[in-house]
Amino acid sequence: MSPVKAILLAMDLLNGVIKHLLDNGNFERITVPCCFGNHGRLTHKPRAKTAPDTSLEWMMYNLLATHWKHEKRLVFHIADAVQLYLPVFEYPIRFMHGDDVSYGGGVGGITIPMRRAIADWDKTKRAYCSMFGHFHTAVDIGNAIGNGSLIGANAYGVRIHAAYEPPRQQFVLIDQKRGKSSVSHIYTDYLPPVTKE
């Protein structure tokens, strides 16, 4: 699938999830953190300052926010840099794709490079927990949570030496008084196929 077609499919899926949550969730407010990564990059090499200007993902998030601009229960937070900081209750959470963390497939997995990167970032701006994807590995290392792969094992996962994992995403609960209280998996390989109405 081409990047443009992938963005259109992702928009369709995200619009469906948002509509489902609005119609069935009885939520007063839904906060949507949006971080771009390497998947939608239009340049061969990553850019630092101008990364959002060349990101199909960043464009998609802005199109979604525009599409839902009249829905007062939705609040989009779209990163203009590789990281986005948002408070959950009084806990500062760092959201990022994760592709800016160097990892060469070492024995300790992503844990050691991620802990090192977080320690460096926390010197400038501390976060209670960092949420990341990119590495196709569902992991909870205390002050960071890595999301699994929505589609499961694939060629990229093999290239980065990721262990086989079923298609899944992380589900995290943060308690107002106790902080992170639960991390569990939402398995995505049994979901019904997407159909157009």
Q: What are these model-derived regions, one by one?
A:
Residues 1-64:
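Core catalytic region of metal-dependent phosphoesterases/phosphodiesterases
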Residues 50-58, 63-81, 89-194:
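Conserved beta-sheet core of the metallophosphoesterase superfamily
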